[in-house]
Amino acid sequence: MTTAHILGFPRIGAQRELKFALERYWRDGASADAERALVDTGRALRAEHWRIERDAGLDCVTVGDFAWYDHVLTTLAHVGGLPRRFGFDARALTLADYFAAARGNAAQPAMEMTKWFDTNYHYLVPEYSPATTFGPGVEWLFDEVREARALGYRAKAALVGPLTLLWLGKARDGLVERLALLPRLVPAYRALLARLREAGVDWVQIEEPIFSLDLPDAWRDAARPTYEALAPGAPKLLVATYFDDASEHAALLKALPVAGLHIDLVRADAQLDAFVADYPADKVLSCGIVDGRNVWRNDLDRSLARLAPVRDALGERLWVATSCSLLHVPVDLAHEPRLDEELKTWLAFAAQKTREVAALRDALVKGRAAVAAEFDDAAAAAAARRTSARIHNPLVKRRVAALTDADARRASAYSVRAAAQRARFGLPLLPTTTIGSFPQTPEIRRARAAFKQGVLDHLGYLEAMREQVRIAIDKQLAYGLDVLVHGEAERNDMVEYFGELLWGFAITSNGWVQSYGSRCVKPPLVYGDVYLPEPMTVGWASYAQSLSAKPVKGMLTGPVTMLQWSFVRDDQPRATTALQIALALRQETLDLEKAGIGMIQIDEPALREGLPLKARERAAYLDWAVRAFGIAASGVADDTQIHTHMCYSEFGDILPSIAALDADVISIETTRSNMELLDAFETFDYPNEIGPGVYDIHSPRVPDADEIERLILLALERIPAQRLWVNPDCGLKTREWRQVDAALAAMVDAAKRVRQKVEEEAPA
């Protein structure tokens, strides 16, 4: 019979139980009582998630999708591969050890974090050296198998695959090629798989998403010998790809000695034909047709029509699944009592998606009539969504259609604008500023909570936030900063804040997803055409500007970042939605300019994150991303200065696109790289002004003026003084005022010192 399964379920719990248990554990110093409470929370969450999967009608539950912090770190713990610098005993690894690797300890910094492929989830980056070894590790996966079996469930285990585990890591200490470690890693996997078989596990989902990438030949060539070594003595192996098209590797994957393959039909529907053609008779094909990365309800009839020919070709060897793990979506729509009822009918969170998978299985096996009520309801919701006036705004569509190339370009070249801006603002050499946000203090959080709970009225809330703006301006004047910001006290999140004010966005009450560890985010929903009904930031910026003669920057989140950090409608191209957001932001920039705000910062920290996994698709993405920024930024006069901020670890491959944004000033995160990131800008001969970060805001450590002066001098080796700004790496919302006070005072002092040196050395 056709099998229904999911690749994984969210870990955090419907009420973020894991988040709060982790934070209690860390706060209580990892005491024995705190550890027992954390372990109990994890066990209860797993049992609840398996119950949801069973009640939905899935044929098996997934174990191994749970992780205390991150599934890549947990996989390393299973195969004894945590970084050697921590000195942990792999077989006796404790939770405290595990969290030390994730968060650092007194002796060692934390492992690096980066984005999981093109998602907004962060994984901990494995560290590989010539001395890296693998072997038996923790028992956690086997504990989960025993828990599931004790509850009467048929368990399918999930593991990150060995090739992906190596690919995701970084080579250190002279290691030339990560693949050189494969002969050491494969035996550890083989032993782990053999033990799973002994534990009664029939199937292991072994995840190799790197087969959705443009893989070098050496990595492709490693696949067959790896799985020839793993298959004997293992349970049945289901090799899972997801996030993009794996069809260029279809022949290779179909030839692997495994029991099945999984492909993502949401991100890459066209690859199905390449896999079904000549599909081996000894393999199942798991079709990921329910979206694991977005929140929209499945069009069950459309999915059934897509799967029916596959069922006819493969029979019971067709499996129905989510496209990827449900880690990336909220847990349960039932916990959204305040969300608009019509909008709710268009949505499916993790709990609902498990049922969609099972319903499709039932229709394939028993016929649509067996699940007619569910299918009819889904069809009605899809029809309503297609025609809803709430989604389709003719005015917005006309405005997008009327856009021209000129709308995405400033009226004058940078050199002309720079002269106009120098005349308007009269800033000193090496002007000092910050990136935007200041500490979100307990007072701010209490006022926001009281306002949301109805305890504090609107006027009371406005006055509380205005007081925070006054504090921020007074402090910046005391530091001696040249360009000020209002501090963003009123913003709970740089995307959600705007989502609450733009038409076409909706905000959930409990739509949390895990970003990393205990960090959760609540992405807005972009459900319809985006429109700006009234100014969003003008009041705050104008009030701040009224408190000082120095320029105050208006602060906006850019269109691509708004898109990347939201759940975006799937009924039109993302590029179209980006242009709609850009038009709304364009109106906001014009409103700010009209109110006398002469500097406007449009942040795009997610521009690089949006790059498609396939190289052939990146140029098209960068074209519309740059155009969207241009639409947002280009309506203003020459003497209005546009800033942007980006925080990446590498810029080289997208520098032409960054230059094409044509922002007057770009600030970037460079402190940890010791200004080496500026090398790419120097080589490229970046033409506009740059503010390389000189203060690492991600650390509680406060730099002194000498340290910051050294960094400014390093920056001057690469960037002319006339185009150099001085600023922190990023926003300061996560820091404490005592840290900010000391660091920014030191930054201004350092800038003044270097300014004096440059002016003294300038030819008379």
From Swiss-Prot:
InterPro entries: Cbl-indep_Met_Synth_N, Cobalamin-indep_Met_synthase, Met_Synth_C/arc, UROD/MetE-like_sf. Pathway: Amino-acid biosynthesis; L-methionine biosynthesis via de novo pathway; L-methionine from L-homocysteine (MetE route): step 1/1. SUPFAM superfamilies: UROD/MetE-like (SSF51726). L-methionine binds at residues 435-437, 488, 603. Keywords: Amino-acid biosynthesis, Metal-binding, Methionine biosynthesis, Methyltransferase, Repeat, Transferase, Zinc. Catalyzes the transfer of a methyl group from 5-methyltetrahydrofolate to homocysteine resulting in methionine formation. This is 5-methyltetrahydropteroyltriglutamate--homocysteine methyltransferase. It comes from Burkholderia pseudomallei (strain K96243). The lineage of its organism: Bacteria, Pseudomonadati, Pseudomonadota, Betaproteobacteria, Burkholderiales.
